[in-house]
């Protein structure tokens, strides 16, 4: 594993800390290491939730390492499994990821956060996609994911001028789930992770799959799709032991014992 990453396992929760002074920027080597970490998380049946954060309190991540770019690393370089930062194109990851944004999330750092399922940020955090000012575009998901969240006028402002969005503005627009003080950030992310662990893992996988694949469909189209047999996890939920265990545990007034099948 790369020196730029710290991995910590707390039972079913994996914490990934990006640690590349001074700005937690991501070059191809670091991106490959992050991809390996997220693939390991995906494939480990004992891990249920991941938290991605940055070291320090100033930068979550400044995105692509411009020093590496100046030394010849191309914008379309191979950034490894899962795309840039290991998560932006990891479309078959059906476990939840929480981005604990501890500071500036710029460029690919913002795109990394957008690829997570939940974003909790410190109150001093800010978000920006300044790529146009560098002669490139935010093509690691920013220009694709942000329009699904924000109105066109706000998107255009951010991607074409590089305007920064504050934590409170991000909360108001629904870009982040919650804003907390810096010293509460990791505790808040861990508490959310513990809440997610209480949900059945197969049901969570099905929910990620359904929301991802039906996002641009009408309700009627979505109904047809989830009943078409095209999904992997939704039919499995309907015939799973967990689907029996949940109601039984509720009736018996005890915590359910999820098996994931």
Swiss-Prot record:
Alphabetized, the UniProt keywords read: Lyase
* Active-site residues annotated for this sequence: 111 (nucleophile), 131 (proton acceptor)
GO molecular function terms here? hydro-lyase activity; L-carnitine CoA-transferase activity
What are the disulphide bonds in this sequence? none
PROSITE patterns xrefs = ENOYL_COA_HYDRATASE
Q: Which SUPFAM superfamilies match?
A: ClpP/crotonase
Q: What is its EC number?
A: 4.2.1.149
Q: Which CDD domains match?
A: crotonase-like (cd06558)
InterPro entries for the chain = Carnitinyl_CoA_dehydratase, ClpP/crotonase-like_dom_sf, Enoyl-CoA_hyd/isom_CS, Enoyl-CoA_hydra/iso, Enoyl-CoA_hydra_C
Family per similarity comment: Belongs to the enoyl-CoA hydratase/isomerase family.
The protein's role, per its UniProt record = Catalyzes the reversible dehydration of L-carnitinyl-CoA to crotonobetainyl-CoA.
Name under which the protein is recorded: Carnitinyl-CoA dehydratase
Species in which this protein is naturally found? Salmonella arizonae (strain ATCC BAA-731 / CDC346-86 / RSK2980)
**UniProt gene name:** caiD
């Amino acid at each position: 594993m790369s020196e730029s990453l710290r991995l910590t396992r707390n039972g079913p929760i994996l914490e990934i800390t990006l640690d590349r002074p001074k700005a937690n920027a991501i070059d191809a080597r670091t991106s490959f290491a992050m991809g390996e970490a997220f693939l390991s998380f995906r494939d480990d049946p004992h891990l249920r939730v991941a938290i991605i954060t940055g070291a320090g309190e100033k930068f979550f991540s400044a995105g692509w390492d411009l020093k590496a770019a100046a030394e010849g690393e191309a914008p379309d370089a191979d950034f490894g499994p899962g795309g840039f930062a290991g998560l932006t194109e990891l479309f078959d990851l059906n476990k939840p990821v929480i981005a604990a944004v501890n500071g500036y999330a710029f460029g690919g750092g913002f795109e990394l956060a957008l690829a997570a399922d939940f974003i909790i940020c410190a109150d001093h955090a800010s978000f920006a996609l300044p790529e146009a000012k560098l002669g490139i575009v935010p093509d690691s998901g920013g220009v694709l994911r942000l329009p699904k969240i924000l109105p066109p006028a706000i998107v255009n402002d951010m991607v074409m001028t590089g305007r920064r969005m504050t934590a409170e503005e991000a909360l108001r627009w629904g870009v982040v789930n919650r804003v907390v003080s810096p010293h509460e950030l990791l505790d808040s992310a861990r508490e959310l992770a513990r809440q997610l662990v209480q949900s059945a893992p197969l049901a969570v996988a099905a929910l990620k799959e359904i929301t991802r694949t039906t996002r641009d469909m009408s309700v009627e189209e979505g109904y047809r799709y989830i009943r078409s047999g095209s999904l992997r996890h939704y039919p499995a939920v309907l015939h799973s032991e967990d689907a029996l265990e949940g109601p039984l545990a509720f009736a018996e007034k005890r915590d359910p014992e999820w098996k994931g099948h």
